[in-house]
């Protein structure tokens, strides 16, 4: 069909997987209820029964992507393998499900409107009046139905029911259910049931009102996940089910847990898969939840603790280092130790901050604020023999510190922070311009030098890691650094871009220009994080 066919059905979308089943996750009452984790948890249950799962996130906000959004407002920016800056929920999906997502799996309202307006300018609509329905709604549906070779597509709709920006997204998924058939779509709604200490009551009215607002948009929820500090009683589930037009068994207690990897187990105990299977007419299969049970057992075990100091500047927002803290947790599982994190403010850093830590990690970041503290942290780790891991900017500050204090280049710096310095870190060619979309983004290959710590860590001579940066170490100084004891142990295949530096004579001092946290798994960890935590355990104070 042509783009100006006014109310075309998504069935006609070229390449759409009409055999897939779709689960839409929406939220109400308040934001930050954990829709992303709920989506990942439902997907994990499906995978445990042998079904393949893909995941997508739709954010109604008007930014084209999260790339230039402040970590203080939005948390971390997650980078996909194909170089797209996405919402952090994609990290949950990839970690829980072990899938590789792409730029078409994180879609914002701004991107939708950008697409529609550009299509209008190109003349794709042949002079038609461009409207929210059908043009914007059709574009949303095209992203929902983008080809995937999977049994299920789990789509999270960001925000809450009632948000102005989100209304067109709710309208689009309502239409989509009609287009592909209601039995091929399931609507799961997250709500909140607050507990009032004064009266000792769990209040269900906010949930009832949220479901009613969803109904105003033409969507009947098929299952509710009610965030609550305790399990709902049978009477409470029956009451919610009656007012929300569903069986009581479809009302799930979204209880608070001390670790998100317990959520699939909590859902499994409440027969969430059975509800999904009944809705879609699937056979009721037994699931294998062994890998999540293993994590639960690890959490309960009495194990030694390794203390890692993270020297950063975005600690005011818990989600700013979400993938990083997850990767350290994963490494703890692999090393059979508990990892305790100490948040160290780079802006007020003092060497005494590291006196009680077993390892120092300096993560990525942008801008000059806090850089001096990060350089001082690298100096502390280098001179005291404390295991050090640097990520992105964490590699750059390690290079700057070494240049200043070992090579004697007193004004060594990055041109990002001082245009008049002696640059040991410089901007990459072709990466100037607007802040958005001009970084070196996504997965790039890296060749590792044999007989180095990096080679020992990875066990191979070629790796692929995800990047998000525009500054690099000046490779023309490689010999000068190597002669003094800091070597480049990983570089781009053409040899031009340093990717890993290390100190061979240090207990553990390894830094990468990439972001290994984006490829860490709760079931296998990541080689660099695993090695770092192992070194911290070995050097434990």
Model regions: which residues?
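A generic structural signal for well-ordered coil/turn residues at beta-strand boundaries
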Residues: 220, 247, 304, 356, ...
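Short, Lys/Arg-enriched N-terminal segments with co-localized hydrophobic residues
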Residues: 5-18
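Cysteine-nucleophile active-site neighborhood
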Residues: 36, 40-44, 48, 356-445, ...
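Extended hydrophobic-aromatic, low-complexity segments
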Residues: 317-321, 333-337, 351-353, 369-373, ...
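C-terminal and late-domain segments of enzyme folds
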Residues: 450-541
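Active-site proximal loops enriched in glycine and acidic residues that flank catalytic Cys/His/Asp
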Residues: 27, 57, 228, 255, ...
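Flexible phosphate-sensing "switch/lid" loops adjacent to ATP/NTP-binding sites
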Residues: 17-341, 347-359, 366-367, 373-380, ...
């Amino acid at each position: 069909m042509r783009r100006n066919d006014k109310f075309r059905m998504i069935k006609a979308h070229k390449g759409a997987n009409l055999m897939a089943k779709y689960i839409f996750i929406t939220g109400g009452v308040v934001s930050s209820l954990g829709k992303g984790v709920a989506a990942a948890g439902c997907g994990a249950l499906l995978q445990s029964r042998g079904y393949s799962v893909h995941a997508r996130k739709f954010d109604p906000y008007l930014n084209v992507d999260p790339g230039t959004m402040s970590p203080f407002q939005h948390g971390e920016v997650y980078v996909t393998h194909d170089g797209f800056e996405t919402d952090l929920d994609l990290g949950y999906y990839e970690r829980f499900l072990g899938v590789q997502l792409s730029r078409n799996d994180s879609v914002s309202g701004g991107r939708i409107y950008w697409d529609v307006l550009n299509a209008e300018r190109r003349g794709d609509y042949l002079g038609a009046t461009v409207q929210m329905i059908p043009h914007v709604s059709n574009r949303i549906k095209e992203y929902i139905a983008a080809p995937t070779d999977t049994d299920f597509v789990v789509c999270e709709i960001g925000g809450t029911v009632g948000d102005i920006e989100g209304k067109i997204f709710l309208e689009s998924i309502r239409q989509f259910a009609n287009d592909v058939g209601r039995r091929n779509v399931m609507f799961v709604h997250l709500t909140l049931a607050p507990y009032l200490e004064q009266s000792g009551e769990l209040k269900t009215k906010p949930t009832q009102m949220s479901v009613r607002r969803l109904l105003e948009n033409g969507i009947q929820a098929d299952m509710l996940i009610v965030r609550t500090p305790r399990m709902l009683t049978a009477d409470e589930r029956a009451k919610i089910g009656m007012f929300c037009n569903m069986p009581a068994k479809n009302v799930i207690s979204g209880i608070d847990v001390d670790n998100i990897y317990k959520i699939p187990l909590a859902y499994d105990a409440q027969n969430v898969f059975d509800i999904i299977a009944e809705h879609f007419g699937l056979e009721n299969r037994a699931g294998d939840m062994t890998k999540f049970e293993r994590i639960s057992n690890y959490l309960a075990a009495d194990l030694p603790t390794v203390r890692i100091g993270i020297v950063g500047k975005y600690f005011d927002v818990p989600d700013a280092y979400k993938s990083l803290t997850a990767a350290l947790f994963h490494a703890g599982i692999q090393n059979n130790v508990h990892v305790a994190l100490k948040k160290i403010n780079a802006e007020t850093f003092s060497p005494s901050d590291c006196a009680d830590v077993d390892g120092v990690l300096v993560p990525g970041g942008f801008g000059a604020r806090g850089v001096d503290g990060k350089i001082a942290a690298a100096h502390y780790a280098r001179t005291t023999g404390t295991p050090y891991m640097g990520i992105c900017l964490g590699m750059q500050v390690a290079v700057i510190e070494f240049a200043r204090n070992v090579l004697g280049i007193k004004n060594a710096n990055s041109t990002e922070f001082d245009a008049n310095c002696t640059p040991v870190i410089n901007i990459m060619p072709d990466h100037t311009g607007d802040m958005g979309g001009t970084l070196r983004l996504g997965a790039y290959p890296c060749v590792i030098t044999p007989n180095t710590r990096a080679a020992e860590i990875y066990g191979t001579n070629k790796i692929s890691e995800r990047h998000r940066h525009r500054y690099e170490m000046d490779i023309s100084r490689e010999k000068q650094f190597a002669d003094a004891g800091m070597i480049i142990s990983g570089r781009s295949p053409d040899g031009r871009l340093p990717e890993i530096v290390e100190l061979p004579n240090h207990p553990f001092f390894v830094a990468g220009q990439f972001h290994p946290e984006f490829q860490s798994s709760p079931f296998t960890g990541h080689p660099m994080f695993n090695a770092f935590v192992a070194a911290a355990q070995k050097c434990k104070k």
